[in-house]
Amino acid sequence: MNGNNNTGNLQQSHGPPQQQQQQQMFNQTPQMGFQQAPPPGMQGRGNNAQTPLQQQRFNMSQQQMMAAQQQQQQQQLQQQNAMAAAAAAAAASGRPVPQRNPNYNGSPNPGQTLPLNNNNNNSNNNNNKTGMYNPNALATGMPSSNLQPTSSAGNSRGHTPRMVNQPQPFIPHQQNQPPLPPQQQQQQQQQQQQPTPQLPPQGQTPQQVQMGYPKKVNNGNLVANQSLKSGPMGGPVPMGGPQQARIPPNSSFQQSPQTQFAMPPNSNGPINPQQQQQQHGPNQNPQPTVSGRSPIQRQMIIATTTATGGKGDTNNSVQEQVQQEINTRIIKRNLGNAAIIRVLDLIEFISNQHYENLSNIEFWTKITPANFLPTAILKFNTTNITGGNGNKSLNDITGLNLNFLNSNKATSNNNNNNTNTNTNNSNNNNKPHQFELTTSTAPRFFASCIQTESILKCNISLSGSKFQVLSNGSIVIVSKIGLHFHYKDGSNSALHGTIKILMSKDLRIEWVDLNFSDYQSNISVSALEEKLKSIITDNTSITKKDIKRQKELLDELVKNSQASKLQLTFGIEPQSLRILQLGDVMSSMKSLMEFSMVNNIPSPMKSMELLIASQKNQQMQAFQAQMAVQAQAQAQAQVQAQAQGQNLANFSGSTNLQTDAQRSRQQQQQQQQQQQQQQQQQSLNTSNNNSNSNNSNNNNNNNSNNNNNNNNNNNGKGGIANGSNNISSPSPRTVNAEEPKRKRKQSVNMSNENKRRK
């Protein structure tokens, strides 16, 4: 080549001529959807990375596209002469041959470098550049300000086209690529249009790889980052393996920051979500895990997984059921806790009130509707308690020793007349007692307990509270309870038992069941101090009488304490217990009071008589109605049994009738057959008799005729007399039923022949 000294002619290594011809043919073929690895001869080039042309077109900005379009228009005029160089290869491949410019003598090979001349004839390194010739490609890369066309004045070849300053990217050759189906081609185009994530090569972190950004400027040329691991031939080894697009080495170009590599399908590189969904199938439901969940959720998840046979994925219905169960459990737990807190708040509210408020009935009547339902019931039950106040009964202590209140009477009488009444009384006193109050009688009992002077302080403690929420929203609370009474004389008593509370949805008490099982009486040291001072003396002055007196004083102290005195009354004053008994009676007479108020009966005795009579009538009516219902049910059962029996009898009778009818029909048929047979036999016999008689008559007639004929013949011929004796007739005894007819016909014929002969 004849060129200027200031122009640098940089040549690249090329393969054999056959490979150059294949490269020239590939440059004229349209670009496919994705790129493959270059031929083996091209792997010996440098490590400069390039991006496919089609991918650069999608990643270019609007200004670059406009500049590229303008330069394309300029290049179309310059490349008309260059199209003649590929005429032979295009004709060999069956493609249309472009028109050749007569002024164009030849063109360089597409794999060779073009010397770019400089008009100023200076040795500036910025102009020492090379360009890759590709007749089917567009000049892309730098903006229009950096695209400076060069002059070909210093070159001996005047036909050399004017090339842009930016070289074109090299597109690797596709060897024997089979045609793909339309669906796969469309999918590949969609994958190229979508941005694909870039992953670092093996052995490098993402911070070390910068594929889409230029690294440095070397003499005016933007060189791509070369941080990829080099392969065995010196070329880059992409992340996707041999099927991934490879970049030809020794090609410097300007790479856009948005440049990305297009991945072919079924590669090991990064794949888009659609490919990932196709490879892994439809999305599966995530398996429920028990980590980071509450104990209830863990239990429900384990139960559902075991119910579904150990499968992690559950149906939507099962998940909804589990969620509903968890929600209901949470609601029930919160509701039960709220009920317990409501009871504790009520106790705290009462304990913080002043004595004046607690001793007033109006205070209790005000707070009762807020915490109890109008139909609420309060029950107090006590077990066997011994000691205190001798052998007195509870009714004797309270003063309500009435016959209808004497419910603790002995149930059985002993046959021995020498039994002691004291033992009976002690047995009656040790029996448990049951009391029941309503919302109208409970406030007076509470106020009377506070108004007693002997009790200084009362403590209530609840421990071990448990709850259960029912299906209708009610809450049952069960807890241990302890009542501690402190008296003026320094003694104290403790009652231990259980309490059951039923609360409604609005957290109001429906009923309370209080059971006391233990009573303990104690004396404090302060109460014993004064007594002990008077008893204790010097050891020298103590005698047997003094010791005996000390014991008696201690016994009197224990017996006279308030805690021991109130043992039979459960630690409360007899007056308060009297009100409790009256409240129990009034609560049991609640129906009587309602009856008297409804019927406007002022007299309680008359209302009681009418109530008892009406209750008896109601009981009788209810009993009669019950008996009528039972009788009706029994009658219906009997009717059903009879109907069933009749159905069975009818069924059996119908079957018997059917069998009898069949039998009678069979007998009738047999009789008819027998009659028909008899009639046939009779008809045969009569026919035989008639035939025999007819045959005999015919034979007689024939004989007579024959005799006459013979006589006539003899007379006419003058023949032998008595010629009829020679003619014999068959005997009727040996003739069958059919033979006489034949012989009769023959006889007739014979008679006719005889007549004709005459």
Swiss-Prot record:
Arranged from A to Z, the UniProt key words for this protein are: Nucleus, Transcription, Transcription regulation
Say if the entry is tagged with keyword Transcription: yes
Gene Ontology biological process: filamentous growth
According to the UniProt record, where is the region Disordered? 1-49, 87-293, 408-433, 650-758
Name the residue ranges with Polar residues bias: 1-10, 100-116, 142-168, 218-229, 249-261, 650-665, 722-734
List locations, semicolon-separated.
Answer: Nucleus
Q: Which Pfam families match?
A: LIM_bind
> From which domain of life does this come?
Eukaryota
Q: What happens when the gene is disrupted?
A: Defective in filamentation and invasive growth in response to environmental cues. Defective in the formation of biofilms. Displays decreased virulence in the greater wax moth Galleria mellonella infection model.
Record's compositionally biased regions (Low complexity) = 11-31, 117-128, 183-210, 264-288, 408-430, 666-715
Q: Which family does it belong to?
A: Belongs to the MFG1 family.
Function per UniProt: Transcriptional regulator with a general role in all morphogenetically distinct forms of filamentous growth, namely invasive growth and biofilm formation. May control FLO11 gene expression as part of a promoter-bound complex with FLO8 and MSS1. Important for virulence.
Q: Which protein are we looking at?
A: Morphogenetic regulator of filamentous growth protein 1
